[in-house]
Amino acid sequence: MTLTPFIVLAHGPSRQKVVEEIEVNAAPDKVWAVIADYCSIKDWNPLITACESDNGSQPESIRIITLENGEQIKEKLIKYDPESYNIQYMMVEPNPNAMPVNTHGATISVKSNDNGGSIVTWKGAFYRSFPGPNPPPDQTDEAGKEIISNLYKSGLETIKSQAEQ
């Protein structure tokens, strides 16, 4: 009997990253005033229709956001730093009907620019929710990136318009 060795390769989701930023013609403190409340996301992101938080903007606070399609996502506040204008959070209960991603974590930060204004950066990383090598078209890495990117861009555009008023 002859045994022939062979290699089995498995390929699942890989970590994806999305970074979006926007320049705002307003000082960082004015921009921060728009986003400072952890649940104010419903006021500056048109893709989010509601937000409920169990403990405001305190670290470990849990918020449940409702998207336009009625689906909800549960997120935990990891870091809240008003002095450096930084909010970090992560998804704690993925909902593939809301977004085809798992383990989404993100940071929103505000920095001053050279013109007296601000740069707002929203960056995140995630794994797609479909675990296997051949995801359906609406659950690919690219689909996840597109949804996250659209979420970030719509929020950043509204932050800009509100802070510049």
Q: Predicted segment positions?
A:
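Short, hydrophobic/aromatic-rich segments at coil-to-beta transitions
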Residues: G56-I64, P82-Y89
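Sec/Tat-exported extracytoplasmic proteins
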Residues: I35-N45, L67, D81-S84, Y152-A163
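A conserved amphipathic terminal alpha-helix motif
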Residues: I119, F126-Q165
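Stable alpha-helical elements in mature extracytoplasmic
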Residues: A27, V34-D37, I73, G144, ...
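Hydrophobic ligand-binding cavity/cleft-lining segments
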Residues: F6-G56
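Hydrophobic-ligand binding "helix-grip"
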Residues: E71-I119, A125
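Hydrophobic pocket/interface hotspot
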Residues: K30-V34, I41, R63, L77, ...
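Bacterial N-terminal signal peptides
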Residues: M1-P5
